[in-house]
Regions:
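N-terminal targeting or regulatory segments adjacent to alpha/beta-hydrolase or S9 domains
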Residues: 1-37, 44-57
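Core residues of folded domains in eukaryotic genome-function proteins
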Residues: 26, 34-38, 92-95, 122-127, ...
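Structured beta-strand/turn binding interfaces of compact recognition modules in eukaryotic regulators
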Residues: 33, 41-45, 99-102, 129-132, ...
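Structural signal for hydrophobic/aromatic residues that build the beta-strand cores
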Residues: 40, 96-99, 114, 126-129, ...
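Short, surface-exposed "cap/lid" segments of acyl-processing enzymes
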Residues: 45-139, 159-162
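Alpha-helix capping and helix-loop boundary segments enriched in small/acidic/polar residues
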Residues: 102-105, 140-151, 171
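Alpha/beta-hydrolase active-site loop
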Residues: 142-164, 183
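Alpha/beta-hydrolase-fold enzymes
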Residues: 162-210
């Protein structure tokens, strides 16, 4: 039974489908040049989520962010952050950056569904970019995001490519996240760091879709 796009949107917003596509995440909070903050949630195994840290390591709770996350998520540790940013040309495992829709986050069912398949079935690393103010990310500036705001995605893609120059980077954007991704690709043109991208359910005429 089809009740139209508005009803579909309301139903998907009301139902989070928490019993399906269960995943664990490690969160890295990114601080940009303008002091804005966004969060990258990396899909991880349960063993990785609950692993015992060494004596010289500790969980890094970023300044201005909430100290307690949902039970299926934790912050990166100090050593994990250092390791992630360390340049390593030997890493060739593909990574997918996922961009959620308006007011979404890594907790959305559509994000968890595709992330679970890519991570568990195909062996991709998956990182969900929670936009400023989304997914329990605390705002550190008055600036939010919109379909034309590609700065944060560009920063993430460039950072990954600089650390892992031989690693294929893919991206998938849903709804508003797809618009951000499409604009980023258009702006970067031949300089785009992405190997491939997919845009799902995005409005092409934002004014007409309002």
């Amino acid at each position: 039974l089809s009740l139209g796009g508005h009803m579909h949107t309301m139903f998907a917003g009301a139902r989070k489908f928490k019993l399906f596509y269960r995943l664990s995440f490690k969160r890295m909070v990114i601080r940009f040049e303008d002091n804005g903050s966004a969060a990258l949630d990396f899909v991880c195994s349960k063993d990785e989520l609950y692993k015992i840290l060494s004596d010289d390591d500790s969980i890094e709770i970023p300044e201005s962010q909430i100290p307690i996350l949902p039970s299926n998520m934790r912050y990166f540790s100090k050593n994990e952050i250092e390791e992630f940013h360390k340049k390593d040309e030997s890493v060739t495992k593909p990574i997918v950056i996922l961009l959620h829709g308006l007011s979404g986050s890594s907790s959305e069912a559509y994000v968890r569904c595709i992330s679970k398949i890519l991570f568990e079935r195909y062996g991709f690393d998956c990182a969900v970019l929670n936009s400023r103010g989304c997914g329990l990310t605390q705002l550190t500036t008055p600036k939010l995001f919109c379909a034309l705001w590609t700065h944060d995605l560009r920063h993430i893609a460039d950072s990954i490519k600089n650390a892992y120059p031989n690693r294929p980077i893919y991206a998938m954007g849903f709804s508003l996240g797809g618009d951000i991704l499409a604009n980023y690709i258009g702006q970067e043109a031949e300089n785009c760091e992405l190997t491939a991208a997919a845009i799902v359910g995005s409005p092409w005429d934002l004014c007409g879709s309002s």
